[in-house]
Amino acid sequence: DMIMVSHTFDDKLDKKFPSSLSKEIITGTLRNDLGFDGVVICDDPSMKAISEHYNIEDSFELMLNAGVDLFCLGNNLNYDPDYIPKVIDAICHLVKIGKISENRLLDSIKRIDSLKKKYNIHGK
């Protein structure tokens, strides 16, 4: 139903990106090779493994295009009251400039909605 990817790096699976940013791992191995069609969630991108190497826009571009559907946004390591609005702005900007397709986001929405229906979870 759901799987969580971490920010760990395994150069046997992807020589360039950690799991949470890797299209090769998430879309290639997990979805295509293993046939997983559920929701992929990733750990908090504000964790140092990501935030020390990527800015908000780059990290969300990579995660979404890799196939991540849902994010843990803890915002507790270096609390920023504007973190969530910055993430939303970054994603909107990435869609506007064509770096993330609307269809990619719709795919995630469909998977999340399907999971919510399966477990009778309501809300918007």
Question: Residues of each region from the PLM?
Answer:
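Second-shell residues forming the walls of enzyme active-site clefts
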Residues: 1-93, 97-100
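Mid-to-C-terminal alpha-helical segments outside catalytic/metal-binding sites
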Residues: 96-124
